[in-house]
Every structure is written in structure tokens, then in C-alpha cells.
């Protein structure tokens, strides 16, 4: 009997490690692991006895110093072989674009890194594993390996949070159900909107995220300890991990001081210029900003990363009697909010108003006429509050008749008008929530 091979992608959160520990007690398979962690964490994985991995690859050990003599022919054939757009992933990589405040990568450096990554992954896949088990990708190289696995016949089993708190899903693609039943094929529990809203409150993911954000915001001890450890430890990581290029101690400390000041100034600006009370005297469409940088745009919706342009497109597409309300993402506080110039440009658009992050999303959903989102769960929450939604990227709840998956920006004016006339049926939402519960498990990823 052939022993199946399973590859785990471990990014330092121990999720894949603990899952492998549990799985090895139940099945007889060969376990392999790609470990994507900084240098100082390698020792733990080298000495751990939780899982008997047949082989471990430390991701950054496979990446050499960037060089100028890049094998473009290899990268060209790689793209064709795996149907992967490398520049799409590379230019949306937070380490390679404007979100990296410490180092600006050149074209040659990026191509050199891509070449090393792709060649390393091909060598690993030569083992012909049957499964990839991993948390959803955050960085471009993780997503490249995920896509390579699918093309190579390796079945991905990807952990991601459900939109229901304390539950997670295991699917081939994050936020895309493997269960392809339509709404018409599903069973309803005959819940009305009041019952659905009570159910949603019971499993409200926003509260779980909010608790995590508050903990990160208020807890100073871990930050102080991390800062002291950084100051008094050696800093060799900037030499052998491209994610830390440019992170000298002087730059890091200077960046910390500057961003703390910016955070306060930005918060003061929002307090002064954002609406804290919803003015519903005129009907409005609601667009929540996405936290950035995050995979929800950079990977899941890669052509919609410019949210200001998206807001302008929506504003241009509204019926004359409607306004657009835009709300800052509360978790953006963990990124020191956004540049004031970002907010100023939005406020300069006639018929657009920014809502303060402290306003509850539920209160907005009760008063808006339509929700438009690039990605994320707010479109489902809109349906629970009897409101139609438009979404710019693939998400499992787009099977709801009240949710329109936008295929082209040119169709936005027509779709907005059509969606404003769309009625949400409780039976459809009820069926979908049953489907979601069937396809998720009790497990807190946070």
C-alpha cells in the first residue's frame, strides 16, 4: 500500500503543527513541512518532538541574496505551466510595495526572489504529495505554492475563519465553499428575520475581532518586551530574510516614534471630520473600508486595492437622490490608521461622507438602502438586516439572490439600480446560514 504524503505550511502560529500532531495519531502518512518563520524561531522547529516530519524545509533558507542575472526564461515557462500571474502577486505583496516603509525592492531583486521561490517549490512538489494542509495565505510566496499545488493535483485543505465567531472552515480556497449546492437545493429552518438576527448576534465575528483588536491595542507589556528584545539582541535577520531588509534598529525605532505621532494626529482628524451620528434624511449606500494591508484585497481581490478609486466609481454610479457613506475599519488602528491625505481625498468627493469608526455597523445596516463591498462578510450581514448587497470579488455568500457579484465596473450603475429594487427573503438567508453551519466546525482560529 502506497503511503500518502502530506505537506504542511507552518507560519509560526503553530496551527499546522498542532493539527499535524493530532493527525499523525490517527493516520499512517508521511508528513513534510515548509516552515516560514524568522531565523530565531528555527531552533524550536528543529528540536520539536510534537510531529515526526520526514523532511522540513525552512522557507528563507531557500532564498539567496538577490542577484541581477535572473532566469527570465524559467519564470516565463513557470507562468505558462502553472497559469500563475507572478507580477500580480508580486506587486500586491506588502513587502514589495508602498506598505514597506523600510526598503524599496528593485525589479531585479523581486524577480530574483521569485525565481528562487518557484524553483524551491518545484523541487518540493517533485515528492508528489497528495495534500497541502495550511492556514490561508498571507504573502505572495504562500499563495504561489497554494496555486501550484492545485495545478499539480495536490489537494489543498485550507483553514480559514468562518463568518461565524469561533468556527472555521477547511476548503480548497479560502471563503469559497467546496459544497456547490444552490439556494434552491437547500433546506430552510423557517426562521424569520428576527430569529436570523438573534442567531447572527450569537455568532457575531465582529465582537471576536473587536476583542482581539482591543487586546492588541491596550496590552503594552508584550510591546515593551518585544522592543527591549529588539534593541538588545543581534540583528542578523536583516541579512538573510528579505522580509526584514532595511529594518535597522535606528530605522525601526524612528519609525515607531513617528507612527505613534501619526496615529494620534490621524485619530484627532477623524474625531473632528467624520460623522458620529448617521444622517439618514437622504437615502444612502454604505461602503465599508477594508483594513490594509491585508490579504482580503491584496490576494483575494487583487485588482481592487485602490479603495479611493473604488469609492469614486461608486459615487459616479449612484442614482441622483442617493449619497455614499464610507466607514473606516475599526481594526485599522493596528496599522496606525491611514494618511490624513487619504481621508481628505475621500471627503473632497461630492456626495460622499466618512463615518466614524465608532458607529456600530448594525446601526448603519438598519438605515442604509444598499451595501457595496469589495470582499468580506458585510454583504451577508446586510442580507440578515434585509438589505441587498454588491460584492466585487468571490465570496461564498454570493449565492444569495440578494447579493450581486460584480463582474465589470462598467455595469456598476445598472447593478446599483437593480439591487436597490431587490427584495431580500428570510428563507434564502436561513438556507444559507444552515449551509454555512454544515460546512464549518467549532474551532477558534484566534
Describe each region flagged by the PLM.
Residues 1-13, 35-37, 106, 133, ...:
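Nucleotide-activated donor-dependent transferases that construct or modify glycoconjugates
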Residues 9-27, 146, 303-318:
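Histidine-anchored nucleotide/phosphate-binding helix
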Residues 22-118, 161-259, 263-264:
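Conserved N-terminal ligand/cofactor-binding loop architecture of enzyme catalytic domains
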Residues 119-181:
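Conserved nucleotide-sugar donor-interacting segment of glycosyltransferase catalytic cores
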Residues 134-135, 141, 160, 357-404:
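A donor-sugar binding/catalytic signature common to diverse glycosyltransferases
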Residues 279-308, 313-315, 328-332, 437:
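Active-site donor-nucleotide binding/catalytic segment of nucleotide-sugar enzymes
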Residues 312-356:
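Catalytic donor nucleotide-activated moiety binding site of glycosyltransferases and closely related
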Residues 402-446:
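Long, C-terminal catalytic modules of enzymes
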Amino acid at each position: 500500500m502506497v503511503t500518502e504524503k502530506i505537506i504542511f505550511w507552518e507560519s509560526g502560529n503553530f496551527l499546522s503543527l498542532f493539527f499535524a500532531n493530532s493527525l499523525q495519531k490517527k493516520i499512517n502518512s508521511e508528513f513534510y513541512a515548509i516552515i516560514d518563520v524568522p531565523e530565531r524561531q528555527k531552533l524550536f522547529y528543529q528540536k520539536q518532538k510534537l510531529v515526526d516530519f520526514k523532511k522540513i524545509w525552512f522557507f528563507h533558507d531557500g532564498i539567496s541574496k538577490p542577484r541581477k542575472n535572473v532566469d527570465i526564461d524559467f519564470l516565463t515557462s513557470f507562468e505558462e505551466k502553472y497559469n500563475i500571474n507572478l507580477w500580480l502577486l508580486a506587486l500586491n505583496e506588502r513587502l514589495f510595495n508602498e506598505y514597506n516603509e523600510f526598503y524599496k525592492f528593485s525589479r531585479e531583486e523581486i524577480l530574483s526572489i521569485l525565481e528562487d521561490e518557484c524553483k524551491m517549490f518545484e523541487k518540493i512538489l517533485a515528492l508528489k504529495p497528495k495534500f497541502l494542509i495550511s492556514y490561508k495565505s498571507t504573502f505572495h510566496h504562500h499563495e504561489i505554492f497554494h496555486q501550484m499545488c492545485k495545478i499539480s493535483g495536490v489537494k489543498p485543505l485550507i483553514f480559514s475563519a468562518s463568518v461565524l465567531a469561533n468556527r472555521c472552515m477547511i476548503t480548497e480556497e479560502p471563503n469559497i465553499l467546496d459544497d456547490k449546492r444552490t439556494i434552491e437545493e437547500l433546506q430552510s429552518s423557517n426562521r424569520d428575520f428576527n430569529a436570523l438576527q438573534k442567531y447572527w448576534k450569537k455568532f457575531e465575528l465582529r465582537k471576536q475581532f473587536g476583542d482581539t483588536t482591543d487586546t492588541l491595542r491596550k496590552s503594552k507589556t508584550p510591546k515593551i518586551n518585544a522592543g527591549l528584545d529588539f534593541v538588545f539582541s543581534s540583528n542578523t535577520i536583516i541579512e538573510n530574510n528579505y522580509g526584514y531588509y532595511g529594518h535597522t534598529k535606528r530605522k525601526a525605532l524612528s519609525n515607531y516614534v513617528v507612527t505613534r505621532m501619526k496615529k494620534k494626529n490621524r485619530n484627532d482628524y477623524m474625531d473632528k471630520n467624520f460623522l458620529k451620528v448617521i444622517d439618514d434624511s437622504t437615502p444612502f449606500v454604505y461602503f465599508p473600508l477594508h483594513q490594509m494591508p491585508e490579504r482580503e484585497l491584496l490576494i483575494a481581490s487583487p485588482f481592487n486595492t485602490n479603495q479611493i478609486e473604488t469609492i469614486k466609481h461608486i459615487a459616479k454610479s449612484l442614482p441622483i437622490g442617493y449619497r455614499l457613506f464610507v466607514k473606516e475599519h475599526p481594526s485599522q488602528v493596528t496599522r496606525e490608521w491611514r494618511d490624513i491625505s487619504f481621508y481628505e481625498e475621500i471627503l473632497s468627493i461630492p456626495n460622499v461622507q466618512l463615518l466614524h469608526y465608532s458607529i456600530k455597523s448594525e446601526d448603519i445596516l438598519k438605515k442604509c438602502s444598499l451595501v457595496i463591498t469589495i470582499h468580506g462578510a458585510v454583504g451577508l450581514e446586510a442580507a440578515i438586516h434585509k438589505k441587498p448587497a454588491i460584492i466585487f470579488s468571490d465570496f461564498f455568500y454570493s449565492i444569495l439572490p440578494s447579493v450581486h457579484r460584480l463582474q465589470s465596473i462598467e455595469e456598476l450603475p445598472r447593478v446599483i439600480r437593480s439591487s436597490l429594487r431587490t427584495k431580500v427573503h428570510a428563507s434564502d438567508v436561513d438556507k444559507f446560514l444552515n449551509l454555512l453551519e454544515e460546512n464549518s466546525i467549532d474551532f477558534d482560529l484566534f
